[in-house]
């Protein structure tokens, strides 16, 4: 075989080998990105569902340092109350209210903020307090032309919703708190931290699959996907949900922990509905009973059986029904 033929053979071999290598590399990179594509697709699907429920996203610049993102009802109906839904630590609002936005959008004009450092909401300011979160929510609502509303908050969102009622009594007509540790005593907080055995920031802002599994086990009472989900999926979930503004999210938790616990919460004037899962391992039902006693006679406590901390995810039908009857009903319903 002459040298020209040998060279053509070698060239063809190298070209074929390179093509196969590139194809294999492409397949591997695509396979590697499947978890990311999965969660991006889910996020897109959730946004489309919110739009299907008659909501649209909007972003409001509160000042040159703070931006807040909302989902709001497209067409306000004056025969419907306004309901502000405040999410907790489990990611942006679309992920947390997916089981509620459909039924509630048929009864209320909805305003759903992403709290600062979640979703597209952000602030360059150093304030990490629940008071600051509440003030930003109200400034955003006023920018949307909303002056009076009922507030509903879950977990961390319950802290913010309570501040809304405390700071803006003329704006907040009714209040719904779901599984939130407002008013827990120093003894209760110490007992819970000892039971959990980990710093709350390590759990509520997980950094690895084991942290996320612990968070799910604490939040849910009923069987869930936590046992079978592979590590690579959980890592991507953490990347999507928690790595954005990770430092700021941790600072929000640290602010709550640095505050001196006070079982005597500020008394508010609004009618208040407390909804609790009887199996809550984060904020036990005894906390709800203490809050109820302090807010009587203007509070009502509803305990949902066989439900954990994530009542909005585990028992959404019960939560939705209670919210609709309370907010739509008479002041003493």
Regions found by a protein language model. Name each.
Residues 2-8, 297-333:
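Catalytic active-site module of serine/aspartate enzymes centered on a nucleophile-bearing elbow/loop
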Residues 268, 274-276, 280:
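Short beta-strand/loop motif that positions the catalytic acidic residue
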Residues 1-83, 106-108, 328-333:
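Alpha/beta-hydrolase fold catalytic core
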Residues 162, 166-167, 171-207:
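Flexible "cap/lid" loop of the alpha/beta hydrolase fold
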Residues 20, 36-37, 186-194, 203-267:
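Conserved alpha/beta-hydrolase catalytic His-Asp/Glu region
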Residues 72-120:
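Conserved HGGG/HGGXW glycine-rich cap/lid loop of the alpha/beta-hydrolase fold
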Residues 270, 284-292:
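Short alpha-helix in the alpha/beta-hydrolase fold that links the catalytic acid
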Residues 131-149:
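Conserved acidic catalytic loop of the alpha/beta-hydrolase fold
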């Amino acid at each position: 075989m002459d040298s020209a033929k040998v060279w053509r053979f070698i060239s063809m071999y190298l070209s074929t080998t390179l093509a196969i290598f590139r194809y294999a590399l492409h397949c591997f990179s695509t396979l590697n990105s499947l978890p990311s594509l999965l969660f991006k697709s889910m996020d897109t699907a959730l946004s489309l569902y919110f739009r299907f429920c008659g909501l649209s996203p909007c972003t409001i610049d509160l000042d040159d340092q703070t931006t807040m993102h909302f989902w709001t009802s497209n067409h306000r109906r004056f025969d419907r109350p306004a309901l502000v839904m405040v999410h907790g630590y489990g990611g942006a609002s679309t992920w947390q209210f997916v089981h509620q936005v459909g039924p509630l959008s048929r009864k209320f004009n909805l305003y759903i903020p992403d709290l600062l450092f979640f979703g597209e909401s952000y602030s360059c300011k150093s304030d990490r307090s629940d008071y600051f979160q509440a003030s930003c929510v109200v400034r955003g609502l006023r920018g949307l032309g909303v002056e009076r509303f009922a507030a509903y908050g879950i977990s961390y969102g319950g802290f913010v919703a309570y501040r809304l009622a405390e700071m803006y009594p003329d704006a907040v007509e009714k209040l719904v708190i779901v599984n939130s540790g407002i008013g827990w005593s120093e003894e209760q907080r110490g007992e819970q931290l000892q039971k959990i055995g980990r710093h709350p920031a390590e759990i509520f802002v997980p950094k690895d699959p084991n942290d996320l599994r612990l968070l799910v086990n604490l939040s849910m009472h009923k069987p869930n996907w936590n046992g079978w989900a592979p590590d690579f999926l959980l890592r991507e979930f953490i990347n999507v949900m928690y790595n954005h503004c990770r430092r700021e999210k941790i600072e929000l938790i640290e602010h709550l922990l640095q505050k001196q616990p006070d079982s005597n919460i500020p008394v508010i004037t609004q009618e208040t509905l407390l909804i609790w899962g009887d199996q809550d391992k984060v904020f036990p039902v005894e906390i709800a009973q203490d809050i109820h006693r302090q807010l009587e006679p203007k509070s009502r406590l509803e305990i949902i059986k066989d439900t954990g901390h994530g009542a909005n995810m585990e028992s959404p039908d019960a939560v939705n029904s209670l919210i609709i009857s309370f907010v739509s009903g008479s002041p003493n319903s």
